């Protein structure tokens, strides 16, 4: 347990930050999984729709500071390659 007022504040901030990061990390995994599943099923329309949602969500995470810009671009690029491979 924290003994100083500033340490108590840091503990509160850490809890909030951890919850926020857990939310974004879970969301990132789920939207990525949705695109990959649609691509694996060969459903081009569903994969394109999932890719649009993923692109928007991933770049929103950049603006919130959860992931870096280059990381987001790499993830979206790899998902787009996967979707474009569907015959």
UniProtKB/Swiss-Prot annotation:
| A single cellular component GO annotation | cytosol
Question: What biological-process GO terms show up in the record?
Answer: translation
Keyword Transport (UniProt) = no
**SUPFAM superfamilies from the entry?**
Ribosomal protein S20
What is the role of this chain?
Answer: Binds directly to 16S ribosomal RNA.
Family matches, as InterPro entries: Ribosomal_bS20 (IPR002583), Ribosomal_bS20_sf (IPR036510)
UniProt protein name: Small ribosomal subunit protein bS20
The annotated region (Disordered) lies at 1-21
Tell me which UniProt keywords the record has, alphabetically: Ribonucleoprotein, Ribosomal protein, RNA-binding, rRNA-binding
Assigned protein family: Belongs to the bacterial ribosomal protein bS20 family.
């Amino acid at each position: 347990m924290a003994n100083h007022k500033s340490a108590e504040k840091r503990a509160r901030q850490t809890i909030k930050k951890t919850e926020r990061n857990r939310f974004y990390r879970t969301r990132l995994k789920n939207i990525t999984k949705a695109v990959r599943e649609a691509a694996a099923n060969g459903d081009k329309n569903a994969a394109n729709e999932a890719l649009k949602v993923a692109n928007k969500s991933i770049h929103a995470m950049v603006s919130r500071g959860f992931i870096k810009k280059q990381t987001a671009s790499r993830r979206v690029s790899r998902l787009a390659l996967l979707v474009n491979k569907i015959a």
